């Protein structure tokens, strides 16, 4: 499989403390990679750098073979909106908007006609079992439903790579299974995924797991 993402010697220093200590890794097209580790191991910091939400102190990141310029905010914004999707532990839905409107926002931001954006939003929410709740606002949805809206929003612009930071952290076991089933289906469709989790049983569902400790990758398990 072709390489979609590569990181070389990533370091991150915050207030004199070295959070990441020279991490190198790659993600292939269609691969589902999990990153596990204790709290404070640096896994979320690494995910944010790979997802272009934060810049490394040192090191390079390549997306589809092209080096990312972290000093060019315009380019970063375009890459994030056109090629990447994000799902977080907290969904960050806009409370004043309906489920459908929340999903449409990133498409309109990229210039998609409103009719097309609405049709895709309806399709995504229906695929995620929310076809009857398009007009509900976040407070009218359960935690699991809110997270599914967030996943639909992350998929709105058909990303090549999806990043997930503890996406099931606030969910019960039934909703955790549902979200993971959705991720596996998305991955089977060809979207690469990088997921941070502290739950080893979830990591075991992925193609490859990287284990972090004290800002370093200390172990790797490949299942395929």
From Swiss-Prot:
Gene Ontology MF terms in the entry: ATP binding; ATP hydrolysis activity; transmembrane transporter activity
Membrane topology field: Peripheral membrane protein
EC numbers on record: 7.6.2.-
Localisation per UniProt entry: Cell inner membrane
InterPro entries (UniProt xref): AAA+_ATPase, ABC_transporter-like_ATP-bd, ABC_transporter-like_CS, MacB-like_ATP-bd, P-loop_NTPase
Main location as per UniProt: membrane
GO biological processes: transmembrane transport
PROSITE patterns, A to Z: ABC_TRANSPORTER_1, ABC_TRANSPORTER_2, LOLD
Domain of life: Bacteria
Cellular-component GO terms for this entry: plasma membrane
Domain ABC transporter: 5-224
Alphabetical list of SUPFAM superfamilies matching this protein: P-loop containing nucleoside triphosphate hydrolases
Matching CDD domains: ABC_MJ0796_LolCDE_FtsE (cd03255)
Disulfide topology: none
Keywords, ordered alphabetically: ATP-binding, Cell inner membrane, Cell membrane, Membrane, Nucleotide-binding, Translocase, Transport
EC top class named in words: translocase
Binding-site residues for ATP, renumbered to this chain: 37-44
Family according to the record: Belongs to the ABC transporter superfamily. Lipoprotein translocase (TC 3.A.1.125) family.
Subunit field text: The complex is composed of two ATP-binding proteins (LolD) and two transmembrane proteins (LolC and LolE).
Entry function: Part of the ABC transporter complex LolCDE involved in the translocation of mature outer membrane-directed lipoproteins, from the inner membrane to the periplasmic chaperone, LolA. Responsible for the formation of the LolA-lipoprotein complex in an ATP-dependent manner.
Name assigned to this protein: Lipoprotein-releasing system ATP-binding protein LolD
Organism: Aquifex aeolicus (strain VF5)
Gene that encodes it: lolD
């Amino acid at each position: 499989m072709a390489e979609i993402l590569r990181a070389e010697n990533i370091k991150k220093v915050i207030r004199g403390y070295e959070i990441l200590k020279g991490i190198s890794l790659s993600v292939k097209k269609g691969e589902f990679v999990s990153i596990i580790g204790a709290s404070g191991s640096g896994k979320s910091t690494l995910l944010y750098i790979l997802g272009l939400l934060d810049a490394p102190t040192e090191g390079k990141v390549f997306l589809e073979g092209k080096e990312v310029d972290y000093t060019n905010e315009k380019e970063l914004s375009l890459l994030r909106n056109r090629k990447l999707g994000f799902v977080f532990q907290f969904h960050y839905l806009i409370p004043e908007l309906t489920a459908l409107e929340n999903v449409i926002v990133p498409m309109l931001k990229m210039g998609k006609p409103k009719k097309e954006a609405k049709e895709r939003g309806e399709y995504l929410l229906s695929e995620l079992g929310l076809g009857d709740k398009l007009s509900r606002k976040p407070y009218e949805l359960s935690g699991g439903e809110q997270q599914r809206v967030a996943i639909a929003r992350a998929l709105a612009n058909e990303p090549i790579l999806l990043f997930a930071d503890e996406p099931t952290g606030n969910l019960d076991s039934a909703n955790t299974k549902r979200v993971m089933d959705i991720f596996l289906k998305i991955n089977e469709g060809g979207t690469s995924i990088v997921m941070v989790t502290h739950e080893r049983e979830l990591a075991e569902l992925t193609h490859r797991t990287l284990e972090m400790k004290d800002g370093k990758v200390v172990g790797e398990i490949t299942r395929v």
